[in-house]
A protein has these predicted regions:
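Non-catalytic regulatory/interaction regions at protein termini and inter-domain linkers
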Residues: 1-147
Length: 147
């Protein structure tokens, strides 16, 4: 008999109105999972500054703050050299950018991965109703909802 690799890819989508709103949605998810998952962040906009401001306003302990600040919020990551298993990959940008990063991930073909695609509702090309159909769950400030 053949042993097949089990692929567990969970795809979440997230819709936000501003960088702070995006970070407010991501923060609880990251806080909950930062000790058991590795995170990679791909973003067209550098989020380092706004994330630092936000984290300084939270009541997280300094270890958690530092762990979160040490994530690469400027979005400059190289996918090719990474073993993506057990990663959560956060992708923030326009449709083309999100598709491009997802294509690169699919080529690497990891066994177990979470992908969170983040869409700005201010982008006129974003159609939340149509986009949501492609995802397992939607992430919002109260956690994630089953679709």
């Amino acid at each position: 008999f053949m042993i097949t690799k089990e692929h567990k890819i969970k795809k979440y989508c997230l819709f936000y109105a501003s960088d702070f709103h995006l970070e407010m949605i991501l923060l609880p998810y990251i806080k909950k999972n930062i000790y058991k998952e590795k995170f990679l962040i791909f973003t067209q906009e550098n989020l380092s500054e706004s994330m630092e401001i936000l984290l300084n306003r939270t009541n997280l302990d300094s270890d958690e703050k530092n762990m979160m600040l040490n994530l690469n919020w400027d979005g400059k990551e190289n996918l090719e050299e990474k073993d993506l298993n057990n990663y959560t990959i956060i992708i923030n940008g326009n449709n083309e950018y999100i598709s491009e990063i997802n294509d690169k991930i699919n080529k690497i073909n990891p066994d177990k991965i979470n992908i969170i695609d983040c869409y700005s509702i201010n982008d006129k090309n974003i159609e939340p109703q149509r986009i949501k159909e492609k995802y397992d769950d939607i992430l919002n400030t109260s956690g994630y909802k089953k679709m």
